[in-house]
């Protein structure tokens, strides 16, 4: 029958119960207990169990932009081999780890699961403080054995979404003990007496890729301009660009379709052959022109607006104005289209 385990056994409490039982037992039982060390002393030394496959592993899962919201799993398969007669064939498993994978000051939630196919055992969300699960197997099972186990490092669905780009790492230790019996839950006790224990040191890496999404672009509207002749004052408007980036980025705004000269001078809205000058700025005072100076192929060009990114949506205000002193052209609707580029 398949076994799904959720709670580790408590070795200290079990040992107290065992010793109490021995104390209340018959003289023969007490004699057996006292004879055990002599038996072990007289028996040729047993070789300790070994992690004969994958005692040290470093494995990586790399997200893509498409699957960043999905669950991520890294399997760490290993085989514990014990050659001693008294080692036992039943198995216990445990781990020590932290519940997060870390990238500098950033982290993602992580857990460990385990599977022991030979005993139809699956364990979800293992105890992270070394609690032992098991023993799994028969009531009495002496002799050498090899047991295949898979520990899986899991980042739950959605845990990596909105996280900064980089490699998130978790290093953990697993250990497995063998016992000859499942009676009284002797998890780890038999292994401690016979050396039937083995360990593994593993590292899980989860790589979050650089990504940027342009969520919203502005439609800047100066509305109705009613002045006749040169405008007495600057006419202002504004819009918002919203991006979601998990890495440093720069937002550039192109020249538009009618700029006075490439990379310089006023941009211009048009109605047929008529033109209405305007400009786009980074600041509310309208002193820093926002364009593509420095080149859209690099991060940090002087014409753009740069930010380190947070992984969450960020909004940047685009300030627009028609300069004071502008002579208004013939009535009509004037438009221009500019290209917004996010470089990351």
How would you name each of these model-derived features?
Residues 281-285, 295-302:
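Outer membrane beta-barrel transmembrane domains
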Residues 67-68, 138-147, 230, 305-312:
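Short proline/glycine- and polar residue-rich coil/turn motifs
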